Amino acid sequence: IVTNVSEYLPGLKKFLGKTFLGKIFGDIKIGTPNIPKRANVHQFQDLLAQAPSSLPAVSFDPKVDIAALPYTGGTTGNPKGVMLTHYNMISAQVSGQAAFPGFEEGKEVIIAFLPFFHIYGQVVLMLNGLTQGHTLVLFTTPDTEGILEAMEKYKATVFYGVPTLYEYLKDHKDTNKVSWKRLK
């Protein structure tokens, strides 16, 4: 499947996406890449046009079938896929709720800078945040200043991070501008 996500955004967001990319990469043409027509290459727009209006019923075993394949460096530092079943993900969500009994369903504001393709970002942050109805403040390219600004602007109550980032935040010149007591 070959696609360009900006083509599917509503008007203003489509324009801003193209404008922002242009500032980063210079004068580039954004659109469908020139991919040779082959039997195994499909344009996303064509697949959408062919999609049925209702989807067929699918049977699966939640304890066996894979729901997601996030990546982690684990203890070795080498990236590896973690095969999560539907059951694993629900168990993680239930464990997340039990681990943080002080969180109020639908009331927390989470700074979500961790990548969702990584197991920590996908399961702990995204899955638990969304299933509990929390607000996730997303970053496409997180930076220390942006994280600190967002923590105050959105009145963050939850911040999941990694030790390296905690060090950067601790030593940052603007860290005293954040109400850290609000975090749970």
Describe every region a protein language model picked out:
Residues V2-G11, P142-D143, A156-K184:
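Adenylate-forming
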